[in-house]
From Swiss-Prot:
Organism lineage string: Archaea, Methanobacteriati, Methanobacteriota, Methanomada group, Methanococci
Assembly behavior: Homodimer.
Protein name as catalogued: Proline--tRNA ligase
Family annotation (NCBIfam families): proS_fam_I (TIGR00408)
Source organism of the structure: Methanococcus maripaludis (strain C5 / ATCC BAA-1333)
Biological role stated in the UniProt entry: Catalyzes the attachment of proline to tRNA(Pro) in a two-step reaction: proline is first activated by ATP to form Pro-AMP and then transferred to the acceptor end of tRNA(Pro).
Keyword entries, A-Z: Aminoacyl-tRNA synthetase, ATP-binding, Cytoplasm, Ligase, Nucleotide-binding, Protein biosynthesis
Location of the protein in the cell: Cytoplasm
Family: Belongs to the class-II aminoacyl-tRNA synthetase family. ProS type 3 subfamily.
Gene Ontology biological-process entries: prolyl-tRNA aminoacylation
Length: 460
């Protein structure tokens, strides 16, 4: 099955997301998928809170005249803005945009709050819906008209040095987040022609899907003083002078959820990282005539033992065990524990890992400790597999001074190996003309094994 078909199929079968809402590019998070989203963003919120970011919430509606202040930035997506033009039947004097991103709203308010250097740094974030009128082919959780989970952080600083340090912190924070949800990545400095409009520079996280295409999953932007000058974000320095703040912003969206689904899934269904799994352990009673009560009493006892540390579900549906195995494999539940009369007689239980399919018989009397060990191995294995997957999709090609020869070499590598092609960095081919020659995207300048490369790939 092709990846695109598998992806659409698994979103429905595993109860992640329903596309049948009657607006293109808009869908519904189903309960199971929403829990994956919730647990994922809980990790992200914790990382932000621990680094002194404050969560807030800004309006969705932006007056047209305020949005227009963004100048160069708004040109990057002015054709994608949704507009509210009426209140009831009455035309509005000023059109209102549905939030495409929040620089305008947040910086307008920051101007009200930042007066002196002691007000800095200011580090705010929110998790909100944003809207883009996507005209390309929409894909659930990947390319949407309503992005339902956009975490955007915006910071303001008194000095360039503090601003640069914030970029480093943001990169480390995002790296830790993607490590926690077992999504592999490379980090690139985007080329000038593909940076965030209005930014000094953009750093981006990309992962690779099973079809060899890359997906941008996170961005970090150094805005310098560009937006501060537009929005008159001034403060009084310690020596009484006036200066503009230095700013950063960085975002992660539903693509993080799409990626953790896509990277580890297999022909059976999802393989969910433990920390974000809605159900971490499913219990399957193996019932035999005359032994039902014994088994159910024991498995309920096991449920009570495990649920103190894990999210556990006891599947007591009146259907065959094989059907239950299939259902929970589709949903990617990390561990399955089977318990039948013979297991009880032998003082044992059978644990099955979703990531490897390995079946492990453990002593029932020591089951909590055994589960803890297996969960730890599961987490470590997913991280190792994630790193292996991205390394298998990286190909280094030798540099050619002949641009046409180099472009043919890159195209051949993309065709044969897919994934990301790394070219030793050289300014002579770091341009849009070369990007057109190779008929692929230049991701940017990427450090790999101590050297600088130009990374190129087919992208979503």
């Amino acid at each position: 099955m092709e990846f695109s078909e598998w992806y659409s199929d698994i979103l429905e079968k595993a109860g992640i997301y329903d596309l049948r809402y009657p607006i293109k590019g808009c869908g519904v998070y189903l309960p199971y998928g929403f829990k994956i989203r919730r647990y994922s963003f809980e990790i992200l919120r914790k990382l932000l809170d621990e680094t002194n970011h404050d969560e807030t919430l800004f309006p969705m509606l932006i007056p047209e005249n305020l949005l227009a202040k963004e100048g160069e930035h708004i040109k990057g997506f002015e054709d994608e803005v949704f507009w509210v033009t009426h209140g009831g039947k009455t035309p509005l004097e000023v059109k209102l945009a549905l939030r495409p991103t929040s620089e305008t709203t947040m910086y307008y308010m920051m101007k009200q709050w930042i007066k002196v250097h002691t007000d800095l740094p200011m580090k705010l974030y929110q998790v909100v819906n944003t809207f883009r009128y996507e005209t390309k082919h929409t894909r659930p959780l990947i390319r949407l008209r309503e992005i339902m989970s956009f975490k955007e952080a915006h910071t303001a600083h008194a000095t360039k040095e503090d601003c640069d340090a914030q970029i480093t912190e943001a990169l480390n924070l995002y790296g830790e987040f993607f490590d926690e949800i077992c999504v592999p990545y490379i980090i690139s400095k985007r080329p000038e022609w593909d940076k965030f409009p209005g930014a000094d520079y953009t750093m981006a996280f990309d992962t690779i899907y099973p079809d060899g295409k890359t997906m941008q999953i996170g961005t970090v932007h150094n805005l310098g003083q560009n937006f501060a000058k537009t929005f008159e974000l001034e403060f009084e320095t310690p020596d009484g002078e006036k200066d503009f703040v230095y700013q950063t912003c960085y975002g992660i969206s539903d693509r993080a959820i799409a990626s953790l689904i896509s990277v580890h899934g297999d022909e059976k269904g999802l393989v969910i990282p433990v920390d974000v799994a809605p159900i971490q352990i499913v219990l399957i009673p193996l019932l035999f005539k005359g032994k039902e009560e014994i088994v159910m009493d024991k498995i309920k006892e096991l449920n009570n033992t495990l649920k103190s540390e894990f999210r556990v579900h006891l599947d007591d549906r009146d259907i065959r065990p094989g059907r239950k195995y299939n259902d929970w494999e589709i949903k990617g539940v990390p561990l399955r524990i089977e318990l039948g009369p013979r297991d009880i007689e032998n003082g044992q239980a059978l644990i099955v890992r979703r990531d490897t399919g390995e079946k492990i018989t453990v002593e029932y009397s020591n089951i909590l400790e055994e589960v803890e060990k297996i969960v730890s191995m599961y987490k470590e294995n997913l991280k190792i597999k994630a790193d292996e997957k991205i390394k298998n999709f990286l190909t280094v090609v030798n540099f050619e001074s002949d641009v046409n020869a180099l472009s043919e070499k890159v195209k051949a590598a993309l065709l044969e190996n897919k994934g990301i092609i790394l070219i030793p960095f050289d300014e002579s081919v770091y341009n849009e003309e070369f990007e057109e020659l190779i008929d692929a995207s230049v991701l940017g300048q990427t450090a790999y094994e101590g050297k600088d490369y130009i990374s190129v790939a087919r992208t979503y």
